[in-house]
Amino acid sequence: MERAVQKLAVAKRLFEDGFYADAVSRAYYAMFYAARALLSEKSVYPKTHRGVISQFGLKFVKEGKFEKEIFDLFTRAQEDREEADYGLFSEIVEKEAKKIIEGAEKFLKECEKRR
């Protein structure tokens, strides 16, 4: 979880400096590392980003151990992260970046409760 917390701190700093796309990317990675940490406690080690999302959905959301609304923040962040990192003509605006960072804060808080 330490890595997740670090990524969230970086996301907030990037946001403050106006680097919204990079902030979204780091906020997503905060959620990604938090999800991996919880999955590792169940001895589940997916090799891909989609695998982490899929397994997290199966092991935590489907089993009723994690709210779907908060999990949806993770899936949305993954889509925005791909757009931020690979989209040639996309622009992540301040409002969207703020929403993703707030989602990452909620996601990490919920993950911490389950450790």
Task: State the predicted function of each range.
Residues 1-115:
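Terminal alpha-helical segments
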